[in-house]
Regions:
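Short acidic/polar alpha-helix capping motifs at helix-coil junctions
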Residues: 1-6, 19-22, 33-37, 53-57, ...
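Tandem CBS (Bateman) regulatory domains
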Residues: 1-12, 51-82, 86-95, 116-140
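Generic signature of intrinsically disordered, low-complexity segments enriched in small/polar residues
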Residues: 7, 17, 102-104, 108, ...
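Short, flexible active-site loop motifs that bind/organize anionic cofactors or intermediates
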Residues: 12-15, 45-46, 80, 109
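The conserved cystathionine-beta-synthase
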Residues: 15-33, 39-40, 80-98, 105, ...
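A glycine-centered beta-loop-beta connector
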Residues: 29-32, 37-53, 94, 102-117
Length: 140
């Protein structure tokens, strides 16, 4: 597991069941200031993902969310990543597919979620460290 993804698996991963109400999903997104929740089974296997954009898209189409449950609007064919994926691979997957969140899976179970913000922050840290090394080299 890369140190970057290892750090992400130590923070809370917010999930809902497929039968959770959309109101509950929205409350969880708002309460934890997150952009997506993963829909999981009782065995912690990924069944889907619901992002803020999924909710907005649904509202734009039908204008109704009362009475809906997670399985009604979740993205079912979820792209996931293994803990061994690199930051550059994450950036490529997320950019090419226009994803903002990817579940991290180990042994068939959800162990974390990586966001595009996490990837950008990691890449900035990497480039800042490289710039500092170059400054040290030049000043030596």
């Amino acid at each position: 597991m890369t140190p970057f993804l290892k750090s992400l698996t130590k923070r809370p991963c917010f999930t809902v069941s497929s039968t959770s109400s959309i109101s509950n999903v929205i409350e969880k997104l708002s309460q934890h200031n997150i952009g997506a929740v993963v829909v999981t089974s009782e065995e912690n296997a990924v069944e889907g993902i619901i992002s803020e954009r999924d909710i907005v898209r649904h509202l734009a189409k039908s204008k109704v969310i009362n009475g809906l449950i997670a399985s009604d609007i979740m993205t079912k064919d979820v792209v996931t990543v293994m803990p061994s994926v690199s930051s550059s691979e994450l950036m490529q997957i997320m950019t090419e597919n226009k994803f903002r969140h990817l579940p991290i899976i180990s042994n068939g179970e959800l162990v974390g979620v990586v966001s595009i913000g996490d990837v950008v922050k990691r890449m900035l840290e990497k480039y800042e460290a490289e710039a500092e090394q170059m400054r040290s080299f030049i000043n030596a």
